[in-house]
């Protein structure tokens, strides 16, 4: 679907804030550590290509995505930086990955022949990173014996084992770091076993956003920063360690403002009724845009610095807010901020996500493609 701007609703993406965040992380890293900017899920809803390009300009050295489709979009935009496919790549997609110089995650011999065949026929060397399951129980090899066995199978002229990595399950826990250290020790044990067998792998990485901020002793050769690249924290306690700026804000303009009499129901299901004459503004956004129904009669938006309640059920394409408390007249030219930078007086994503009974990772990813992204 072609995204147009014929509707007064949009997402603002601050590339200056993104640059600030990348540089904050670069300054925070251990000297030998590189920064991978994770831009999967269309850059967490921010737009993968603009985010990737600016992140690299600001100092990131590597990109990370979940699947090959996401990486191909970045390659088609002319971005040539290394890209790691963090998830599984099926055999039928391996050739395209190798053709476009994408780095594959491998944790079994399932795709090994496809990788070798692709590299041989394309006259290229396939780069791979081995995935270790140190306690997430998702994908990866669990033991040093399994890793060594795979490493032995990978000793062919068609393949370059560039990296090995794991993923932390509980690094954002502000009450205990025990499980994170347990995972780190497991990963280190596997590294030691590989070295004892004579294997040396150049890039070892384990830190996600939370671990990158909280555990500098685990930075190793590279860190993978996803959610915090966008100025969002996996845990509130991490704000005390590293200053970041929220990159995304969600805005709209009213399509109608009207006075509604007392005792008048608003929207589907009659879940809200005015107590007095109220000034109600209708916004051209709804749950199809990621403006969740869970915010109905619970959430607030900001108009002229005033927090205005969302009233009635949020519809698929429209929603209503009560602007009665705004001190100035609200017009169709006024900007309503759904969420934005807390330091600028807007409702932060953390609050919106909590009211949606989810996490801000999901909140930003839910904003639909029909909401245009404006890069400022």
UniProtKB/Swiss-Prot annotation:
It catalyses: L-alanine = D-alanine. Substrate binds at residues 138, 316. Keywords: Isomerase, Pyridoxal phosphate. The modification N6-(pyridoxal phosphate)lysine is found at residue 40. It holds the Pfam family Ala_racemase_C. Its cofactor is pyridoxal 5'-phosphate. This is Alanine racemase 1. It comes from Oceanobacillus iheyensis (strain DSM 14371 / CIP 107618 / JCM 11309 / KCTC 3954 / HTE831). The lineage of its organism: Bacteria, Bacillati, Bacillota, Bacilli, Bacillales. The gene is alr1.
